Amino acid sequence: MNTTPDTPTPRALRELTPLEARILGVLVEKQHTVPDTYPLSLNALTAGCNQKTARAPVMNVSEDEVTTALDELKRLSLVMEGSSSRVPRFEHNMNRVLGIPSQAIALLTILLLRGPQTAAELRLNSARLHGFADISSVEAFLDELAARAQPLVVRLPRAPGARENRWMHLMCGDVNMADFASADAGGGADSVPPSEFEALKAEQKRLADEVARLNALVQRMASELGIDVDAPGDAS
């Protein structure tokens, strides 16, 4: 999966702080999921950083902390501040600075927001950012990110009993493989990776929201037709 000819040349970057990495992930995510409110205000960006779903780890940061991190990201050209609104709004510039295509940005974003993921989890969790045809295409982009002169992701040791390796971003620096190997071994074959658990919780919430939406639709249609859906059925 080679980058397209118009993909900008990547720049060497310093290691990011966890909050700086979270901010980038939130900006990319919201660009795709709530485009009407993107670029994001400081308030919306802080809320996205502190979001309790689809985040690992969960953070609790202030607007002052986010502002400080934004200043650093602007110095690195990773974030740009718009000037067309009375309220300052922020957008990411990852594709140009990192020199990677949108597919790779989508995968990197999920790793920034949710922590280590398998290729299958990445395909599921990145669906709203980019629709990958299959797991092989996900792995191809991951392999490219890992093979760069300054790698952006790394394949972690496979946990005992696990069928797939997990991947982790390197935007905050290198990881100690031995730490992950020992942590995975201590979890046992029956343990569920946190990223997989988060994916299951997110899917459960999505299904619950869909059921609630359909129930509200049925109630509205029944009301328009004069039908009491809560009344007991005719037993005759």
Swiss-Prot record:
Gene3D superfamilies: Winged helix-like DNA-binding domain superfamily/Winged helix DNA-binding domain. PANTHER family: UPF0502 PROTEIN YCEH. Pfam families: DUF480. It comes from the Bacteria. InterPro entries: DUF480, WH-like_DNA-bd_sf, WH_DNA-bd_sf. This is UPF0502 protein Bcen2424_5610. Belongs to the UPF0502 family.
